């Protein structure tokens, strides 16, 4: 019998970790850290044959250096991006040591999409494209004859940087699926609409002589935003002003350029036509950022919780300047305070009065509710489904949707749940 043990990522976003246990072997699907609290799953690394990583975001891979795993499987881009995620975590929190990162990197084995790997005599797996960030994968396992699809984070729609998630997948017994936007209330505007809103907000500020600060996540969101802005500048629909970048997004964007064959083919075509899709990456020079000329500043971190973006927030003293939030802002973060209309913030010693405009235009690398519904209709019908990686309301809502749509048993585990399959 195969057991699924849920160590995290249940009725929450963060700390994703599922253990697949058999009598002859066991593997972990992701081993993430909570972005809010730094909490990690409690697992026995000595008993685990391997960790299979879906992608390089902190909530899916951040806990790996805490442990001494024998083997870590991921795609080639994910290995490079995980190094950036781990080094960022080390710099910000001192959660682990450089030697821990080195140990993890030395035990990574990289695979391409669709390439099969046997881990133990009764466990083999392969990766499908998940469409979430560069190198992101859904994990397809065959364990004691059972076929399990762990989606990781998926986006069934096309983005500027990536092709959509694969849906032409082998037969499935058990589906383990994310539910970030699992509620019928989680229907997002079309990507073109969001892009127009972003450019209109930037244009308004630039034309008034102001500066635009855009906090981003280093991997995925940063590249999408840079691609959009540079595309509109090239087309003449946005004034050509300096774009300054700061933080680990500079290294992450270099990784994106290194793996151009893993991206949307349109990006490869741009490069072959001598166009830099992400624009010239200029490290922010504070003497230029804080002068009187209009500019755009794209910097980590996405939730304004640490990172170099904090030093640019004093620009919001000036009503001409603007902050554009492009993603989810967790409870307790400075980003959430700003989103909720804080009139004053204190990222450092001195308080900063907020006179500039703060707007939110959410660009998500996750599929919205409609996208998730399309996904479950396109893939082979599983015998049962398990819903995780979503807040309680979203997970329970999407479990109900799966039941109504596919008429199959659907589970919403909590941390510590053990399910026999």
From Swiss-Prot:
InterPro entries in alphabetical order: Beta_Casp, MBL, Metallo-B-lactamas, RibonucZ/Hydroxyglut_hydro, RMMBL
In alphabetical order, the GO MF annotations are: metal ion binding; RNA endonuclease activity; RNA exonuclease activity
Q: How does activity depend on temperature?
A: Optimum temperature is 60 degrees Celsius for nuclease activity on RNA.
Family annotation (PROSITE patterns): PROKAR_LIPOPROTEIN
Look up keyword Translocase and say if it applies: no
Q: What is its EC number?
A: 3.1.-.-
Short name of any one Pfam family annotated for the protein: RMMBL
Which principal EC class is assigned to this enzyme? hydrolase
Family annotation (CDD domains)? TTHA0252-CPSF-like_MBL-fold
Q: Which cofactor does it need?
A: Zn(2+)
Tell me the cofactor note. Optimal NaCl concentration is 100 mM for nuclease activity on RNA.
Q: Which residues bind Zn(2+) 2?
A: 59-60, 153, 389
* UniProt keywords, alphabetically: Exonuclease, Hydrolase, Metal-binding, Nuclease, Zinc
Binding partners and assembly: Forms homodimers on heating to 60 degrees Celsius which may be the active form.
The family classification in the record reads: Belongs to the metallo-beta-lactamase superfamily. RNA-metabolizing metallo-beta-lactamase-like family.
- Give a short account of what the protein does: A 5'-3' exoribonuclease with a strong reference for 5'-monophosphorylated RNA and no endoribonuclease activty.
Can you name this protein?
Answer: RNase J-like protein
The beginning of the lineage is:
Archaea, Methanobacteriati, Methanobacteriota, Methanomada group, Methanococci
């Amino acid at each position: 019998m195969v057991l699924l043990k849920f160590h995290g990522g249940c009725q929450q976003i963060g700390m994703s970790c599922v253990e697949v246990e058999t009598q002859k072997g066991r593997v972990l699907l992701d081993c993430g850290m909570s972005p809010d609290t730094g909490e990690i799953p409690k697992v026995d690394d000595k008993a685990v044959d391997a960790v299979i990583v879906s992608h390089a975001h902190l909530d899916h891979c951040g806990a790996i250096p805490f442990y001494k795993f024998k083997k870590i499987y991921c795609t080639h881009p994910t290995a490079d991006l995980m190094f950036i995620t781990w080094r960022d975590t080390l710099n910000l929190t001192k959660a682990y040591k450089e030697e821990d990162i080195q140990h993890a990197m030395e035990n990574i084995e990289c695979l391409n999409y669709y390439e099969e790997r046997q881990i133990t005599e009764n466990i083999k797996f392969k990766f499908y494209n998940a469409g979430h960030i560069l190198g992101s994968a859904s994990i397809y396992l065959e364990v004691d004859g059972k076929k399990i699809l762990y989606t990781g984070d998926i986006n069934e729609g096309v983005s500027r940087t990536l092709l959509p998630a694969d849906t032409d997948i082998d037969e499935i017994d058990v589906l383990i699926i994310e539910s970030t936007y699992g509620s019928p209330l989680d229907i997002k505007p079309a990507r073109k609409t969001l892009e127009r809103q972003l450019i209109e907000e930037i244009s308004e500020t630039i034309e008034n002589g102001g500066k635009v600060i855009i906090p981003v996540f280093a991997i995925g969101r940063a590249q999408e935003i840079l691609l959009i802005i540079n595309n509109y500048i090239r087309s003449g629909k946005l004034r050509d002003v300096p774009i300054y970048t700061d933080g680990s997004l500079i290294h992450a964007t270099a990784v994106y350029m290194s793996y151009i064959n893993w991206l949307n083919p349109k990006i490869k075509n741009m490069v072959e036509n001598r166009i830099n899709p992400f624009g010239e990456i200029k490290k922010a020079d504070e003497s230029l950022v804080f002068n009187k000329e209009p500019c755009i500043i794209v910097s980590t971190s996405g939730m304004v919780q640490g990172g170099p973006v904090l030093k640019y927030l004093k620009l919001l003293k000036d009503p001409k300047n603007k902050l554009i939030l492009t993603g989810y802002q967790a409870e307790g973060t400075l980003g959430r305070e700003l989103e909720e209309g804080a009139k004053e913030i204190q990222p450092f010693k001195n308080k900063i009065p907020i006179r500039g405009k703060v707007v939110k235009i959410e660009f998500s690398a996750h599929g919205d509710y409609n996208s998730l519904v399309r996904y479950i209709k396109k893939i082979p019908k599983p015998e049962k489904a398990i819903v995780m990686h979503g807040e309680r309301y979203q997970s329970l809502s999407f479990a109900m949707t799966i039941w109504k749509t596919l008429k199959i048993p659907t589970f919403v585990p909590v941390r510590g749940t053990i399910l026999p399959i």
